[in-house]
Swiss-Prot record:
Family per similarity comment: Belongs to the UvrC family.
Subcellular location: Cytoplasm
Protein name (record): UvrABC system protein C
Subunit architecture: Interacts with UvrB in an incision complex.
Amino acid sequence: MNKQLKEKLALLPDQPGCYLMKDRQKTVIYVGKAKVLKNRVRSYFTGSHDAKTQRLVSEIEDFEYIVTSSNLEALILEMNLIKKYDPKYNVMLKDDKTYPFIKITHERHPRLIVTRNVKKDKGRYFGPYPNVQAARETKKLLDRLYPLRKCSKLPDRVCLYYHLGQCLAPCVKDISEETNREIVEDITRFLKGGHNEIKKELEAKMAEAAEKLEFERAKEFRDQLAHIESTMEKQKMTMNDLLDRDVFAYAYDKGWMCVQVFFIRQGKLIERDVSMFPMYQEADEEFLTFIGQFYSKNNHFLPKEILVPDSVDRDMITELLETAVHQPKKGPKKELLLLAHKNAKIALREKFSLIERDEERSIGAAERLGEALNIYTPHRIEAFDNSNIQGTNPVSAMIVFIDGKPNKKEYRKYKIKTVTGPDDYGSMREVVRRRYTRVLRENLPLPDLIIIDGGKGQINAARDVLENELGLDVPVAGLAKDDKHRTSNLLIGDPLEPVFLERNSQEFYLLQRIQDEVHRFAISFHRQIRGKSVFQSVLDDIPGIGEKRKKMLLKHFGSVKKMKEASLDDIKKAGVPAAAAQLLFEKLKK
């Protein structure tokens, strides 16, 4: 901890507020709130913490704080600061998690539409629905039952919907406001859970039509009833009061929190939302931050009622959201809370199981690979592969695996500079020399294991440069392949000896992933270089096309094939003078 941090920690007040943690570049990396700033901020720098909190603390170089007059004010300020700074260690809910609604537009002749955007435009919104298909099915049913206008702009003649009986044709007929209002009220009644009443009305109309021997009309009513049954059957009833509500519950363990949200609309459980994130505050405070962001950042529909666990501050949530907040003690609402909590615990348990499985696949594999090679665990592995075709455009590539996982930010590509022709040994010497000269010069981390995707000659070439030129003692292993060019085993030691691994072991799979990845990376780089080389050769010796114009053409057309397909005018439009364009066009057509 630096001196400035110690001095600022000593001056923290015994008041509520927000704190902003900053890194070396003065970037805000975490925003938190506290009932007592002094206690909360100091806690980061004292005692033991789990790995993720240690990682956060290790990056803190400075902090600032803002005192507030209440805990609620601190919560609101925290939400605003998170929006402003977008800190990398804060929970940021995704913007794209929006649900579809059915909307009755506020127009002279209203329309029924499916939308994801809830606006304050006097339209009536119903939902959300679990997915757009559910919303469209319900709208399709309503279109059959209620003939509202369908066209966004009124045409000058009737459309197909009029002939299907699904539109009153306000484009050519004088439809009264009273008629529109009655239809809107019927749709509203249906969407608010009154479909059973509407079913009874349709059954009565069907019976009346049958008595009058109007069998076609009776069949229409029967079909409408069947559509209501099939559409509404898909939506399970959970509450009898038909109220819109969101049910929140959370579980936490090992420094992680899972929040489950059940969406209840018109008494139906239509969908749930699952969020999983690391904790840096007390559980109840993490939850308050989450629920504040949930409605503000995602623009979620705010229902009439929210159910939350007993462990959180109900009054603060009520003030924050301005809706009814309840903490039920028994009955169906309590059962919903318990069900959401049970799901949160299950989701956490599954996450930890996946983490353990992933660690077994990555860290565990690296540990056992070290045991098989009789070296320390190779937390950092660097692998090399050469690529050329008969010595042309020779390149090499290096990839990095850390704790059994690829770290693509540290991948490197090399154009071979000192070797001509197909000389894999010389190429390997050059690349290893360039890589580890730079590592030593810039004090970069050394690998625990170097893997060469090549035979004994390349392994010995790499080891010779490391030991005799650079004075480095890093284990070097080679990937031996079978006759189908698949990973067979490892070569290591002096002299080189094969190390056999079980083909179904995680350490063997790790080697396969490394070999496939370094080969892919090298090949893709070689293709890129070769493509540029072919492109350049086509453009050689054409007056008026120098290096600058070659690059421009490469960028414009992308490949020789596309340039050959181009017309003379296309080449001119790419910025080539007429005379040079004519020469190039003729050369391409030969």
